[in-house]
Amino acid sequence: MIGSGKTAIGEQLAKKLQWPFSDLDREMDRELRRSFRDLVHEKGWLAFRELEYKICKRFSRMDRTVIALGGGTVRYEWNTDILRGTGIMILLESNLSSLADRVRKADRPRVNPGVSLEEDLERIWSSAADLYRGCADIIYHVDQGKSVPEEVEDIYNLLQAKKLFTAEHAESAEKNKIE
């Protein structure tokens, strides 16, 4: 979901795992050579979703990479179809007021621009919560008063508990513990 901390947490998780990190929004900006926000404003959400799909196809071929998807990526079946089974999907859940606070600080295009930010987020979540949760292998609640490094440790421990890493990998990640 938009504003949940995907990039901040993803970057630090990748560092801990010693894996590369990719962010869908940054990849879009790189490919467009400008902000994806401009694409949405100039050509609309359909053009955005087409580029998103193209990048998701590229992501689906990556191995051992932490990827921060866009907040709405999994709401579209064509994206989940190509991403399903390619890795572990982690949903970062947050309460709507925290999301609104974070989104308000960023210049993000709105899905429902005719309503308040809170109503926009509520509509997105209520229409897609089952999709988000259905795609997730792990659901982590970010509104627990923890720092990003603490959240990364929690997520790493959840990944370990699901036996998703080898002993060698766990040893490597322990050397990169985030303080």
Language model features with spans:
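P-loop (Walker A) phosphate-binding loop of NTP-binding proteins
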Residues: M1
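Walker A/P-loop
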Residues: T7
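NTP-dependent small-molecule kinase module
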Residues: Q12, K16, S126-T166, A170
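ATP-dependent small-molecule kinase phosphotransfer cores
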Residues: D23-I82, P109
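Short, flexible helix/strand-to-coil boundary loops that buttress conserved ligand/catalytic motifs
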Residues: L32, E52, S60, R102-V103, ...
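Well-ordered beta-strand positions
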Residues: T65, I88, D137-I138
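Short glycine-rich anion-binding loops that position phosphate/pyrophosphate groups of nucleotides
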Residues: G71-V74, N95-S97, G145
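A glycine- and Lys/Arg-enriched "phosphate-lid" helix/loop adjacent to the NTP-binding pocket
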Residues: G85-D130
